[in-house]
Amino acid sequence: MQTIRAATLYTGTEVLENATLAWEGDRLTSVGQGAGEGPLYPVVTPALIDAHSHIGLIRSGEPGAEAEANEHMDAMLAHADVLDSIQMDDAGFRESTEAGVLYACVLPGSGNIIGGDSAVIRNYAGNTNDALICRAGIKAAFGYNPMSVREWQGSRPYTRMGALAILRGKLHDVRNKLAQEAAVAEKGEGEAPRYSAEETVLRALLRREQRLRVHVHKADDVAALLRFVDEFGLDVVIEHTCDVHDGQTYRELAARGIPVVYGPLDTLAYKVELKHENWRNLAYLVSSGVTYGLMTDHPVILQKTLLLTLRWFLRVGLSKQAALEIITRQNAAILGVDDVLGTLAEGKWASFVCWSGDPFALESYPVAVYAEGALIHQEA
């Protein structure tokens, strides 16, 4: 068994003073206050988690022509797998790990109406098979982005209504096949319809076996998505919402139980659908009661700066503990990995970050980083 001590320990649910953390193998065996053995660190937190990124797809030190966030061959690629394009030799992974961001959800970009499957990964793994933890939904995009890439191949929309017409048509076709399949099963005769690879994914969405992770910034695009939710019964997570500047949108999402992965903060409002982007919009988010997490959208902002963006949540009134929970416990819950990550508790992975001081102080940095029980980074 190994142990460390923390003058201050953020568990992801509470703050403990003079605490001890113990683990055996990759699992925590005890977390609590009291005397213990092992090195003493000023502050210890759970491993940080980025809930939405393109790390390993748009890679540090490589030309843009080699980026793989968006496949250009068609606007509907539900059966694409983001894991097939992630390259673990991206220098961004090392920088993230050194900053305490050990886990990330990687998604296809937002140029396509549906871009493919996501992957929750270990940033410190040597290859993508070892990196993969689980899937966290199929990437889709509403709003400006799918209509902004008209020069790409395939059927490309020129308007929002064109993009959603393509998606609606595909979902209708698969829903009709599901009805045919049910009729054949009920009668016990006839031939059940066959599903293509793309239709198999859409079928899983209609059956709520898969979540749809939807890029959307503006309130009216959120409204359009909610119409789809009502029409097709989809299970969705809303990504971004940086242009939403009213409380009603978030209150409706809260009432419907639809979570938001907010961000990225600290980036240029580089398009019209971000004209109302402002960190002060966070007040609407945090006061609404909606379940939310936080992203970097790496490389839109670098993943290693994830914790720095929490300062805006402090500005709107959150405590340091509550802010840290966004990129630990809350992100883990949205991604479906809260059984092993997000909080420091007995039975969970021994993945944590030991800091030189208060993580919110500019001079502080990780001095030791543990991933599933192993020391993977240490500063001299």
What role is predicted for each listed range?
Residues 1-35, 42-44:
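N-terminal metal-binding scaffold of metallo-dependent hydrolase/deaminase domains
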Residues 4-11, 333, 345-380:
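C-terminal cap of metal-dependent C-N hydrolases
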Residues 59-86, 127, 141-149, 191-195, ...:
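Active-site gating loops and adjacent loop-to-helix segments of metal-dependent hydrolytic enzymes
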Residues 60-61, 67-73, 77, 254, ...:
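His/Asp/Glu-enriched, well-ordered alpha-helical/loop segment
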Residues 82, 178-278, 333-335, 356, ...:
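Active-site core of metal-dependent hydrolases
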Residues 99-223, 227-235:
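Polyanionic/metal-chelating signatures
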